[in-house]
Amino acid sequence: MSRIGKKPVVIPSGVTISVAAGNKVEVKGAKATLSKTFSTDVTFSVADNVATITPNNNSKNAIAQSGTARAILSNMVEGVSKGFERKLKIIGVGYRAKAQGNELNLTLGFSHPVVYKLPQGITAETPAPTEIILKGADKELLGKVASEIREYRKPEPYKGKGVRYEDEYVAKKEAKKK
């Protein structure tokens, strides 16, 4: 059986988990409320501030789904209690970002500024024009938004210009010699 799927998810105080028909799980906390529909191959049980996920049968898929469901549920619990944060750095002459409400204005060397509309549940702040901090309760959505922003101008391998994650290492190439 999946080793991750065997571990119970500890529910901190202030967080409630409810399981509805069709494996629809709703997690409520101080920061947000998240809901997700999981595979019918797993069963959820919540008791004494601990949630456990068990596969319905011993098929390979059900066992794999139990580990996946446990990891997602753990991220949902952490997201509604603490929240998640992703930092992006912008490197390049004239490359800037500015957060305005639920929009992010990016100047990335195109002939026009790029306006990225943030989805509900994600907030952005720009402490410096070359730094973006994305915050949200949904880890999956936060990663998707960060990836979409990075996609506008990926770091190039010669000078390293572009949008990158804060902890990302960009391998640099040497310029062609004549």
From Swiss-Prot:
Keywords (A to Z) from UniProt: Ribonucleoprotein, Ribosomal protein, RNA-binding, rRNA-binding
Superkingdom field: Bacteria
Task: Spell out the PROSITE patterns in the cross-references.
Answer: RIBOSOMAL_L6_1
The record's Gene Ontology cellular component field reads: cytosolic large ribosomal subunit
Gene Ontology MF, one:
rRNA binding
Please cite one Gene Ontology biological process associated with this protein: cytoplasmic translation
Coiled-coil intervals, chain numbering: none
Classification via InterPro entries: Ribosomal_uL6-like (IPR000702), Ribosomal_uL6-like_a/b-dom_sf (IPR036789), Ribosomal_uL6_a/b-dom (IPR020040), Ribosomal_uL6_bac-type (IPR019906), Ribosomal_uL6_CS (IPR002358)
State what this protein does: This protein binds to the 23S rRNA, and is important in its secondary structure. It is located near the subunit interface in the base of the L7/L12 stalk, and near the tRNA binding site of the peptidyltransferase center.
| Family under the similarity heading | Belongs to the universal ribosomal protein uL6 family.
The family database entries (NCBIfam families) matched by this protein are listed as: L6_bact
The record's note on quaternary structure and interaction partners says: Part of the 50S ribosomal subunit.
What name has this protein been given in UniProt? Large ribosomal subunit protein uL6
The organism's taxonomy opens as:
Bacteria, Pseudomonadati, Pseudomonadota, Gammaproteobacteria, Thiotrichales
Instruction: Report which gene this protein is encoded by.
Output: rplF
